[in-house]
A protein has these predicted regions:
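Acidic/histidine-enriched, beta-strand-rich ligand/metal-binding domains
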Residues: 26-28, 116, 147
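Conserved polar/disulfide-associated segments of primarily extracytoplasmic proteins
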Residues: 47-144
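Bacterial N-terminal signal peptides that target proteins for export
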Residues: 1-8
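N-terminal "mature-domain start" segment
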Residues: 22-53, 153
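Short, low-complexity, Pro/Ser/Thr/Gly-rich segments in the mature regions of secreted, periplasmic
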Residues: 142-154
Length: 155
């Protein structure tokens, strides 16, 4: 009797998270000064966190602040390739996923039980990026959200 009850409780806990991407309200966010744009789930990232630490754009948080999304354009005055730009940023050890092309780079790592995902597209004098971080324990629930955000980054 205890196992079915435990299963029911875990369903109640995870059902809202499991429906994350499919039930989300999505809108296009545009950085006016650069034209960089991305689809973002406005029903998930409900709090405006203001300007990012570097570059132009915006930072957003979930209501409980367990996850955040930054959309930004970072100056690339030397027009470095994505590989060179990434190397200059000196990414941390522990990268679990990396893909670099002439047009973009993607890196992901786990730090402090959080997944950090970063995609930057090469622009004209900028790198246009999305940075997403969320609890590692919720990876499966966030996969479709991260994929859609990443695949819709333009600029």
């Amino acid at each position: 009797m205890r196992a079915p009850r435990l299963f029911a409780v875990s369903l109640l806990i995870f059902i809202p998270t499991l429906a994350l991407a499919s039930d989300a309200e999505w809108r296009r966010y545009v950085i006016p000064s650069t034209g960089t744009s991305v689809d973002m789930p406005v029903s998930i990232f409900t709090s405006d966190g203001g300007a990012p630490e570097s570059g132009t754009g915006r930072r957003f948080f979930t209501e409980d602040r367990r996850a955040d999304l930054t959309v930004q354009s970072v100056p690339n005055p030397e027009n470095d390739s994505p590989a060179t730009f990434l190397a200059k940023q000196r990414p941390p050890a522990g990268i679990i996923y990396k893909r670099i092309t002439p047009d973009f780079f993607v890196v992901s790592s786990i730090r402090n039980d959080r997944i950090w995902y970063n995609r930057c597209n090469r622009g004209n004098g900028t790198l246009n990026c999305v940075l997403i971080n969320y609890p590692a324990a919720e990876k499966r629930q966030w996969d479709s959200v991260v994929t859609r955000i990443s695949n819709t980054l333009r600029g």
